[in-house]
Amino acid sequence: MSAQMQSTPETFPAFCEGIQYFADSFPEIDRLGAEPLLGPDQPALPDASSEAAIYQTLLAADALRYLTLQVTGAKSSGHPGGFASSADAVAALHLLGHRNMVTEVGHHAPGFYSAMFLDTSLEDMGIHTVSDMRTRFRERHGLLGHLSGAIPGLLAPAGPLGQGQHFALAGAYLHRDKLFPVTIGDGGLGEPYIMSAFQHFATAYPDVTNYLPVLVWNGYSQEHHSMVSLWDNGRMAGYWRAHGFDEVHLVDARDFADTPDAPVYADSTTFGFAARMAFTGAILKAADAASRSALSGRRACLIVKQLKGAGVHATGAK
């Protein structure tokens, strides 16, 4: 993501009104971004492995990060860093057509509001432009600091750590032909409720698997630091398998870094264009595979490991 301020374009879509900074044109935009792959008659990517699908997922992830900054900056309030680590996974699942997404991370509210803005859900409450969204953030008549299930497009509230999976499990039980992803943060994973809930549900309803935990593993948390920062990939994957998950789809940003000195928790947004495409392609492939398995009777989870604050902080959120 560019930090350079550019002049305002002569023309831009009406919903962009209120955006304060514009970057140079994204690489390959004319070849891979000229025509949207999604539309009124195409709610999901027709081919998740295509170069255009990967490219447009990358654009969506950066759009989510940028809008999150716009929203939090408007009122000098909110937490953009945590959601930024999950933006790639959220974008991938949305473009794959899986939009019944909940979270246990109340601080991710600005990112989820940004997703609802991009899919036009917020138009039902009179939010049509970026300026509208900035104005209505952190207002009683608008977008609350923590998620509210009363916001169009959102299925459930979020706030207390470790509580979001209950909503995903309930949705999966009631609507077994749909996928219910739930994003889980580092802090939330340290709460006992999450794995306990998954275990109890699997015991009671072993045939209901259409939920997908999405762990945002970024190495920082307000609590439970030892668990999130000291484990390696093998131990993390083993932890989920030990709790009965059939498949663990783990994508580590460091594996795609184009510099030899990438830290353990790498920031994918600092990679070159080719490396960013490779990382996004891996996210999209893993999200697609995990989703298909969850909808086919196998317990699956998706783990994305990268630096907290990826793309919205100069050196990550600490």
Which residues are covered by each model-predicted region?
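Charged, glycine/proline-rich intrinsically disordered loops and linkers
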Residues: F12-P46, E123-H141, D252-A278
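N-terminal amphipathic, basic-rich helices that act as targeting or association modules
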Residues: S2-D119
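Glycine-rich ThDP/TPP pyrophosphate-binding loop and its adjacent helix/strand module
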Residues: L143, L147-K318
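A short, flexible low-complexity segment enriched in Lys/Arg and Gly/Pro that occurs
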Residues: S49-A61, R136-F137, M277-K285
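Cofactor-binding active-site loop characterized by glycine-rich and histidine/acidic residues
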Residues: T57, R65-A74, F83-Y205, L230
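Generic detection of intrinsically disordered/low-complexity segments and helix-coil linkers/edges
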Residues: Q6-P9, S131, G234
